[in-house]
């Protein structure tokens, strides 16, 4: 899998969330992702354009849940824990 020139083996959790958010939204230039290390693991904060918020969250939160599932699976392979926070 290729994430904008970064091989999957070297891609970070931040890169994964950024790739998914830019692919789903209509305004990829307004996607902002930050990663903060906490005691519990990596906290990934995602900020998107207000008009893209519904697309990122999805009906009844299904899209956000799927992104979180992918993030958790990738983090587990890295023996880490990751939490996704979607900011308004």
State where each predicted segment sits.
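An amphipathic, aromatic/His-enriched active-site/gating alpha helix that lines ligand/cofactor pockets
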Residues: 63
